[in-house]
Amino acid sequence: EKKYFSGAPEHLKSVRREFPQIPILRKDFLLDPYQVLEARAWGASAVLAIVACLQPAQLIGLLSSARKGFLDVLVEVHNAKELETALESGAKIIGVNNRNLKDFSVDIRTSFEIARLLEKEQGYCLIAESGLSERNQLLELQDAGFQGFLIGSHFMNNQNPGELLAKLVAG
C-alpha cells in the first residue's frame, strides 16, 4: 500500500527474488479476495487482514481466498470485540496491534489484555504488533504467550536496522 505503508508490488517481487525461502507478509489494507490473489502472484506468503477495516463476511472471504492460495493470514485485532470476530471467522494467526488507529497512541498493555482472553485457548499463534522497541518487552510478551512480533517503524527509523535487530534479539 503506497499511501500509508510506502509499499509497491515491486517491493514484494524483489524481496521474493532475493530471498526465495523466507516468509513475506503483504502489509496492506486488504478489502477484496482479489488482493489476496495479487499478493500470491507478487510473492507474498502471508497477508494482513485488519478486523477494524472489514465486515465479518469480508474477513471470512479473505481467509477463504488465502487458504485456496496457500497463504497465511495475519488477522489484526485491537480489542476483545475484534478478537471475537477474528475467532468466529476462523483466524489462526492473531496479531494484536498496540497502536490505536483513531489517535495513533501506543499501549502494549493491549497485547497482554488480548493474551489473557486467549490463555485457555489452543491452536492460535499470537503476534504482538507496534510499539515494541526493548528486549524486555519481547521477553514479557513471549512469557504471556506471544510467538512472534511485528516491528516496523522502530527499525525503519534507524540508520542501522540490522544492528538494532541484533541488539533486540541478543540483549
Question: Where are the language model's segments positioned?
Answer:
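Glycine/Thr-rich beta-alpha phosphate-binding loop at enzyme active sites
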Residues: E1-G7, L87-R116
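Active-site beta-loop-alpha junctions enriched in small/polar residues
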Residues: E1-K3, F29, A52, H78-A80, ...
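Glycine-rich phosphate-binding active-site loops on the catalytic face of alpha/beta enzymes
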Residues: E38-Q58, G95-F104, F146-L165
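Catalytic alpha/beta core domains of metabolic enzymes, predominantly
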Residues: S111, A115-E129, S133-E134, G152
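N-terminal active-site wall of soluble small-molecule enzyme domains
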Residues: E1-L74, E82, S111-I114
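Glycine-enriched alpha-helix->loop->beta-strand junction motifs that scaffold or abut catalytic
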Residues: E18-I22, A41-V47, R67-L71, E88-G95, ...
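Catalytic cores of alpha/beta
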Residues: L31-G43, H78-S89, A128, L132-I151
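C-terminal helical cap(s) of enzyme catalytic domains, especially alpha/beta-barrels
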Residues: I108-L117, Q142, N157-G171
